Amino acid sequence: NTINVITLGCSKNVYDSEILMGQLKANQMDVKHETSDDANIVVVNTCGFIDNAKEESVNTILEQIERKEEGKIDKLFVTGCLSERYKPDLEKEMPNVDEFFGTKDLPNLLKSLGADYKHELVGERLTTTPSHYAYLKISEACDRKCSFCAIPLMRGGHKSTSIEDLVTESEKLASKGVKELILIAQDLTYYGLDLYKERRLSELMTKLSEVEGIEWIRIHYAFP
């Protein structure tokens, strides 16, 4: 089997797809990113944040359903924010999708793809960005209850990744030639409050700046 992962939405989804593909590669599986030529299994990683993104996600799923009906692919799986937020509706409207998964269902998605979730793979990813830079997701989700934002509904409460694991991941990226880290999260300035009971973004950046080979660090998604 060859698995094609299609990524829609923001850089955090790109990161999630890279983690998925890293797990698949560690399971000795043939995985592609956004190519439809020779893959017989497709995973669509969706966005559900704004109307345009929802429309793009739905249209992409429908395109892949059509390809499945034409016999061009054997199986179709959908994951990500749209699937997390609207799973019952999507299952009803799109019965030709083999299975829908939410934002925290990676082990179950891997199982359906015939792979095992490997807990020991700290920082192992199949990067899709140009070789000189990579995204580094330092935390997941958000505790703020802003009336205009659905992220807590789709991603849950804020959860930081430890400084040690992020340094390990950065060292692995640097060993592959990455020179620039782009730090991403729902809210970078919240980093560390759950793990360390205080904000630790500055300490994290100091540690990352000490990683040999990393020359630039950029921060995205700060609040306010």
Label every PLM stretch briefly:
Residues 1-191:
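Proteins enriched for Cys/Gly/acidic motifs involved in redox and nucleic-acid/cofactor modification
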Residues 187-191, 215-216, 224:
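Conserved radical SAM core fold
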Residues 194-195:
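Periplasmic OmpA-like peptidoglycan-binding domain that tethers envelope proteins to the cell wall
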Residues 198-216:
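Alpha-helix-loop-beta-strand connector modules within alpha/beta enzyme cores
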